[in-house]
Design a protein with these regions (language model features):
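Basic, nucleic-acid-interacting segments
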Residues: 1-179
Length: 179
């Protein structure tokens, strides 16, 4: 049985934007030390389809706990998941739209932020907010046209600082929410 296959490879590229955070007006620089911390244990919930995510359930059953450090000027109640997200950062949205135009991509008519489940504790809410901005773009590299399937705008995760012997993970919230 001989079949002819062609190699195809994809790459996902992330670029932090030099703006305020995506859903609040906090600065987006990283700090060297955290001031204060709080503990959280994330629990799995039933989806709108009536099912519990198996990965979230397995992480919960490990009895893992998460401790989060705050940083002055880079953390507010939005990162702590104690306040709803504010309106999307217009500078970050404009950068994503401009980049999409530069790629000749098809910008989505109505942009909505989706919630992707995150079970490792790197987001205090248990999910990451991501928006599909555009599809079907391309970039010319020499004599080749490289397809760009999608452009998304999303918030970055918290930084893992350490893991204790008890499987408790310490995250710093300065990076959480950077577009």
């Amino acid at each position: 049985m001989s079949e002819d296959y062609e190699m195809m490879c994809g790459i996902e590229i992330h670029q932090q934007l030099d703006t305020k955070k995506l859903f609040c007006s906090c600065d987006s620089h990283l700090c060297d030390d955290g001031q204060g911390a709080y503990f959280r244990r994330l629990r799995p919930t039933t989806s709108e389809m009536g099912e519990v995510d198996r990965a979230a359930l397995a992480q919960f059953q490990r009895h893992s706990g998460y401790r989060y450090q705050c940083c002055k000027g880079t953390t507010c109640l939005v990162e702590l998941d104690e306040e709803p997200p504010h309106d999307v950062n217009p500078d970050a949205m404009q950068i994503a739209l401009t980049f999409s135009e530069m790629l000749g991509a098809n910008i989505i008519d109505e942009i909505h932020f989706m919630r992707k489940i995150v079970v490792d504790g790197s987001n205090t809410s248990g999910f990451q907010r991501t928006a599909l901005i555009a599809t079907d773009g391309s970039v010319d590299v020499g004599d080749r046209k490289i397809s760009i399937l999608s452009v998304c705008l999303e918030e970055d995760a918290a930084r893992k600082v350490e893991t204790t012997k008890n499987d408790e993970v310490l995250y710093r919230l300065d990076r959480l929410g950077i577009p």
